[in-house]
Every structure is written in structure tokens, then in C-alpha cells.
């Protein structure tokens, strides 16, 4: 076997007949499988031991040689070699076909490779191959045309006309083989290149296609005639097994049936040829053989598929590779692993952030080998076998050993669906009783887990390296920030929020108000003994609290509450005392009004202060973010645990209960509804009198009911009692929002009908009053739609993530600095007056390209190539700077990846990104994971405002990334200049917009109903939209430059996500958009050996031009191409990656003809062949480390080496298309 970690590239080519023979260990001549009596494989059959190897280790078929000492001997009685039975997974056989047969991939694929090579239509090919027509192979001296097609009847007539032997015409794959042998590649390529100089239209397109295929054959060394098979490889028997079931029946792989048909027909054909049977019978048999081989390679590609019992189509070699259940996705990209388990999860409120609870029985099974080794090491028993017995018996002594073994041995917990990297995190196991895994409540948000029956899987990292990586890189306590936006992902929720909210409440006039304490302990003791309430405002000597006070504050009394003293207890030293729930207090300290001189009038001072609101969920999030910024991970996770404990403790003490009486009543609800009824009546009257249209009536009625609901909501908010338990839950952010509250106490309002249209009849009742039967019926629409939408959305969002990952999986941070001379000019993103993403947010964590100066003073705020921190970004914006040139992924020059400076900080850690970080995958996850939160709907704008539907939510994101023509497309101008006139043409129901500029004039026809974005006299730039709507990016690329298109796409994606309240870092979208514009179409090859019209990577294109320019030639010209992510994934340089994504057969067909080499640079290719991935610690620069003292310069900029080139030998794994391996579980 080839050592996976030693080879650096993998090539796929067409297999020549001699190659297939060299693989084979013998010819399969009989269709038999195994003998029904002896259950031994039949000789020369599909499971023959002579050909494929022994069925038992180190034993020949007849039993003459047994044991390993005879290894390598071939038995003189039965002819079986004595070796491991594992060879039955790798030894191949072959079938000598009695007539040539075409390979269906090359004849049937789109475009047909055979058809292009021979310049024949696929229809004509099919007629010849399946014996329906003759093709002229050699016209000799007759006027017949070479390659012309004739029916049986025409053939006989021509023979009569010109005489026997005057020309050669044949049928079947044999004829095509002869034609393919005649193809002179060099000559044809030269002729096509000449033709391309003058050809236009369809002719040109066809010539480019033919040239592409012929050139592929020429450069790869594949011979066109190898597309016809004279010899068929038989894959190893253990990859198409037969298993005996209970009751003596057999279950066999479909491939055995398909091979059996081929062998039967081949043997029958041989017999007919021996007997000199009539031509028509032989022809029929040859056609059947062709169909049998077609079915074996790709059943169902042509005609009706061959079916097995119960008319189920048989799974052919192609089906073994395709789709989710195929070889690539089922067995190569994702395998089931040992040392894993799964169970229901339950909450573990007492756990630390880095711990998880593992049930004892589960742990003993998972850590069995470790426990057994330790038992032997302690001399409790002598050998491993006895240790195993001890463990299985459940001996008392094993539990203490288990405790020691699992100490500091992290385990991984994973919850499906794993939407982003936080879906798998490492924890230290803690043994618990029971059968459920215990999960820390704060990591639930990252996993999107809850405890209503969710299950999670647990995995054990085995090697020292794996344990180290789990502990250092994956420990849950390290994952404070969300990679998509750099905000904390572990904010407390529910009970924890409620407890801290209750703890920090302030109330006037509670017991003990105005007491003064010398220190924290005295205050807490007074509270515990009931002298002072948690919410009472009291005084405490400032210098007794260990906080960063100023000298002046140190000798005063601080006015606060006992709850806040306890709350500040858990905060790290060095953080200001938290008195008010706002950012000013958090960053600058307590305002002066809360300090009183020693001996001051405290009751009076308290009565002059307003009551502060308590700390809500959002405030807690801000505190965590600030602490992370100041103290980093360790301190933050410790604080989170303290905050969790405090929250749980005080929500228990608060003892909140909810009863129906806690839902308030709005006194004047009846009047508000009565008023609305009257107004609706007026609107209906206006409609009846013809004063307004039906659409206007509908909009006015729905607006009226909305207003009524809002009025009720406002009343509720105004009259709410801050101590009402429901209000507390809602206000703190623990559960529920104002909309839920107003459905409980106000009115439910308008509902959507199944078609998405809002129904005019609102639900006037609320849940406290109860709904009528009709109202209940109306509500069911919304509930059902919600469920179906969620189900559909989840599938759509998952597929989007899969496409995104596939297109960007090989984008890795490859170097420190690419030295680009370009940058990206950014400003805030806004839509009309609405701010979508501010400049400050966009600048944070990026590197500058140019110096940023103060617009008024000219003072330098930050130099070039410097990291913009949060504070610097704020300073830049406060100075009034509106646009900044930054380093961007768009302008990065690194090949197959990005450099550290163009990427900026890693949002998940808040530090500069490391070389080796798989930023492409992280970007894909960051965009895909919130996909489920986006809406599905296309908004219908009441039929009045405009006639276009604006696509929003998930469909719009897909539209952008697939570079589709948008719905409601905007008209753009190709001329920079002034709008001179807008004319309306009533006859065609259109408007004409005239733009005049220096380069010329433009006249644009826009629909009558479209809303204009420009007016007469206005200035427009090239590519500017004249009407409302989305711009088609491909059209924009034709008018403007690549950077403009990239910037436009970035802004559009941000608009969708931000409008739904989802924040995503720009850099993630930049990574994806850059992958969509990596290709160039060659327009004129110049002196390079590129082919006109081919699509190629921009780097390969520049390389080709560099070589020509150095030699003083004419460079090629090309045009950048924008591709959707699906197409971009299939156009990747790695055929393994593309084949495992979609259209497997098409990708492999194309790769084999080109003799493509996969250099294994991306992640997927390496996972497929089982090599460590070239990202993170798997990069060569980290794996080949030798510890020694090093100077920093050399460390940061190591000598450039091609990734993956460890000291290796080049191994060409000859993977023919015809040999498609399949493994069976």
C-alpha cells in the first residue's frame, strides 16, 4: 500500500488496455460466484481465490498450506497464494471483451467527449454504437464522405452501387474505435486554431469546445481510442461482497449482478462467433453486451435502468460514488469513529466552564484501554486479557483508576447540526451518576442546545498531540467570542439573567434604607439577618471596596444597594464599581453624584437620587465584552462561572411565580377597539363610493388595526409595574418580549393567511381573555406556516453552508504579508437614511493601507500597515474621517489563500490571525450558520408602491452568492455623465432615460412603474442604478472593475443580514466574494500557449503572461468572470474536491481526459485520501519543526516552500476512471 503521508500529488488518467491487464491477477471467465453446497468461491468465477486471493488468512483453498510460515507460496494443488485475506480488497481481475464496447461516460456525458473528438453529433454516435446505422470509416475511391452515417438499407444500396470492398463502413463501438484511431491530434488542433481566427457565433463556440477536448488529449498523453474498452477491469470481491443471511439466503452487492450479465453476454457472444452465427444475431449480442457494460458503469444513464427484485434499479459503479450515500460523502469525507458515544443532555449548573459531566458507565467504556493499561501497570493483574475481564465484570477497583485516568484528559462534545466551529468543543470530564451527559448552561448558546431532549455525541482524543490540541485550542472556556462577529457568545440567559436582574434592582423605602456600613462583610451580615433589604439604598465606606478609586473618592461614602455590593464582589479587580447599567460607568467609573462626604446627610442624598434600572441581559453582555477586552480568556471564564452561580442563587431566592392575575388589564381596550371599528367603517364607505381603490382600502384597514395594537402596547408599557414577574422576565431579557406580552394582555392583532397575505380581520382578544373559535382557527394558519417555514429554511440554509464551505475550503492564511500595493477604500454602508454598518464597525480589527490624518488639523491618527483597534477606530470616526483605505482580502496577492495583514484580526480570539488558520471554512460557517435566522419570504409590496417583488432573507443571499439575475433588476448606466431627460412613452408603457457624458450618450428604457433613483440634471457614475432594485452583478462587471463588483456584493449581503439583526464581520463575506471572481476567460492568447475561450485561475494566467513578457512576446488578454459559488466549486483546481461536491461523474470524466493532477492543497482533498489537512497544526511549517533558538525575522518570513512538499517521492497513483473502488460497511 502507498503511505498516505508520503505522496504529494494524485493523478487520474484514462486506463489503456495494457494498464488494465497489468492491474489484473487473472481473467474472470464464468458468471458463478460461490458454490451453494460448499460455500466456497467457484474457479474462474467472480470470487475466485486463485485470482483475488484466499478467503482465510494464511491458508490456501484446499488446506494444504496453513499458517504464516508458508507466506508467499502458491499452492501446487489449488493454485491459491498463501497470504492475508485483506488482498481481496485490492486485487483486481479482468474480462476480455469479445467485441469493443464504448465507455458511457465519454459517449453520453454533456458535452459528449467522443462526439467532440470525432466532430460527430451524439445522436449519430448513438445510432452507430447501438447498431442502428453504419458509419463510413474509409471511403477509398467512392464519393462517400468520411464519417457519414447510413442506415442498413442505404448501406446495402451503396454496396450494390460501388461493389463489395470498394469502401469500408462498420457498426458498433468497433467502428468508433477505428475512427478514434484515425484522429491526428496535432493536425486537428492546428486547423481549429486557424479556424478560430475567423469564426464567429455558434461555429466559434463549437470550435472552442472541440479545441479544448483535443488539446486535453494531446497534453495529457491519453489516446482517444482508450474511450472504447476492449478489456474490462473487475473490482476486488471484498468491495462487492456476498453475505450469508440467517436462513441460508444470500445478500449480494448489485455489482455482482451487473458483472454477471456482462460475463454471460460476453461468453454467449464468444460462442456465436465460434459457430459463425448469422450477422444479425451477432450484432444483437454485441448490442446487448454494450448495454450490459453501460449498466455496469452507469445504470440508467441511457434508456431504462436494469432493475433487480421489486423493480428497484441496480446500483452501478457510478452510483457508488454519487450523492450523499456515495463513496465520497459517506465514507471518505465523514466516517464513523471508535471511542465515541451519545446520550441525552441535562443541565449541569454546578460545573465549571471547562467541565462536562460524563456518566460512569459511558466513561468506563470510552476509556477502557487506558483503564486496562493502568490496571496492568499497577500489577493488579498480569496481562491485558485479565484486565479486560476485570473491567467487564465491573470490579470495585476500576472506578478509582477511572477517576485518575480521566483527570486532565479532555473529551469533545458535539451537537448536530454542527453549523459552526463552536458545534464541537472540548471539556474535562467529571464522573457523574445517571445516564445523561451534563452540559454547562453557558455553552448552550454556542451549541444552540436546550434540555428538552437534545442529544449530544462525545469523542475521546487519543494521542498526546490530539489531547494537547483539544486542551489548548478547543477547550470551552477559551471560546468566549463568536467567530462571525467577535461578540461574546457565552452571555448568561434565562435564570441567570433573572437572578442578576433581581439582585441589582433598586427600590425606594425598603427596610434598612440609609444605613451606612464600614465594609462589605458588615453589609452582607445585616442583609442576612434581615436588617436591610437586598434592594435598599445604603452607604458603604469607599476605601473598604477593592476598586480603582481616585484619591478624592477614596475617603467618601458610596451610595449603592446591598445587591450591587454582592454583584461587584464577583467582578475582577481593576474593573470600576458597577452602579449604573451603562457603558460610561463601565469604562470611566461611578458618576460623582453617588459619593457623599463622610458624615453627610445620607437619607436626604438618597431621596434626591433617581432609581437606577437593574442590569439586563444586554448590560451583562457588555460587561463580559469589556472584561474580555481587558483581562482575556482565563479571567473571563472564571467571571462567567461566578455570574452564573450568583444568577442561579438569586433567581432561586427571588422566587418568581406567574399566575393569570399577573397579566395586567388595559382599562380602555374596548374604547380603542370601538374607535378602530368606526374608522374601518369609514374606509369601507370611501371604497364603496369609489374614492379609493381596493388595494388602498386593504392597506388602510390593515394599517388601522396595526395602529390599534400599537396603541394598546403603548398603554401596557406606560402602566407596567416594575415588580410584576412577567414584566421582570421580559424587561431583563430572560424570556419573552414586548410582542408576547402584548398578546397576553393587549390583543393578538393581524394574522397572515396561508398564502402569506395579511387577513383584514384581526384577532381582538388576548390570551388572558381567551380566543373565540373563529379567532383560534385564524391563529392556526400562522402557527402551521411557522413550522413549515422553519423546516424548509433549515434545509435551504444547510445546503447554502455546504456550497459556501466547498468554494472556500482551501482559503488558508498562507503568509505574514503579501506586499500588495492596492487597498480597499471603505465608508459606512447605508441604505437611504438607514445606517446598515457604521465605519467604526468596519474598521475595527483591520490593517490600514495608507496613513489616516485628522481632516482639520492634519495630525496623523494612524500610520500605514498598522492594526486598527477598537479605540483607534472610534478616534478615526470621532475626528470626522468618512473614508479610509484598508488592507482587504479583495486586494490580497497571496496565492490560494490570504495573508495575515490583509485579513486582520481573528474575530474568534481578538488577536492577529495566525498563519495556517482555515479562514475560508470559518467564513463559510459564519455566513451559513445564521442562515436559519433569515426569513424565507419574498415581500409583496401591497401592489401600490412598485410592481417588483423585492427578494429578501435567505433567497436573496442565495441569489447574490450564486450570481443569479436578481428579481426586480435595476437598470444601470454605462455612461458617466448627466441625466439630460426622462421621457414617458404611454404607448409602450415605458420611460426613456437619456444620459450624456464625455465618452458618449446612453439611452435606457425602464418600465413605466419602476421607481426612479435619478432626476433630470443629476450626475451619474458608470454602473450607477437609474431605478430602484438590485443590480445584476455580471452586468456591473462588464461596465465597472472587479473591485466595484466585489464592494457591491459585500454591501448587498450585509444589507440582508443586518436588516434581520444578524451581525457578520466584513472579512467573512470578502473571503467568499473573492472566491467568486478568481477566474479569467482568455480572450486572445497572444504568444502564450493558452487556448482562446478557456477559463483559468487568475494566478495561472498572470504566470503564463510573465513568462511570455520575459521572453519579449505578446501577452494574452483575458476578462474576469464572476461565477456563482456552485460553479466556482466545480471549477476548482482539485478534481477530488469538485467530484465530492456535485456532478461527480462529469468532474471525473473531464479530469481523466485531461490527466489532471491534484496537488492536495485544499482541505477536502486531504481528508479524502486520509492525509492530515494542510491547515493549522497540519501545515508543513508546523509539522517539520525542529526545536532550536531562532532569530525572529527568519521565523516570521521563512524561506518559501510549496505547501505539502515534505521530503517526498512523487507517486502517481494511477486511478483510472474504470476502476472505481467501493467499500462496504
UniProtKB/Swiss-Prot annotation:
Stored Pfam families: RNA_pol_Rpb1_1, RNA_pol_Rpb1_2, RNA_pol_Rpb1_3, RNA_pol_Rpb1_4, RNA_pol_Rpb1_5
Claim: Metal-binding is one of the keywords in the record: yes
Record: residues binding Zn(2+) 1: 60, 62, 75, 78
Gene Ontology CC, one term: DNA-directed RNA polymerase complex
Catalytic activity: RNA(n) + a ribonucleoside 5'-triphosphate = RNA(n+1) + diphosphate
Cofactor binding summary note: Binds 1 Mg(2+) ion per subunit. Binds 2 Zn(2+) ions per subunit.
GO biological processes: DNA-templated transcription
Protein keywords: DNA-directed RNA polymerase, Magnesium, Metal-binding, Nucleotidyltransferase, Transcription, Transferase, Zinc
Enzyme superclass (EC): transferase
SUPFAM superfamilies to which the protein is assigned, alphabetical: beta and beta-prime subunits of DNA dependent RNA-polymerase
GO MF assignments: DNA binding; DNA-directed RNA polymerase activity; magnesium ion binding; zinc ion binding
Function statement: DNA-dependent RNA polymerase catalyzes the transcription of DNA into RNA using the four ribonucleoside triphosphates as substrates.
PANTHER family named among the record's database cross-references: DNA-DIRECTED RNA POLYMERASE (PTHR19376), DNA-DIRECTED RNA POLYMERASE SUBUNIT BETA (PTHR19376:SF54)
NCBIfam families on file: rpoC_TIGR
Stated family: Belongs to the RNA polymerase beta' chain family.
Name of the protein in question: DNA-directed RNA polymerase subunit beta'
Organism: Streptococcus pneumoniae (strain ATCC BAA-255 / R6)
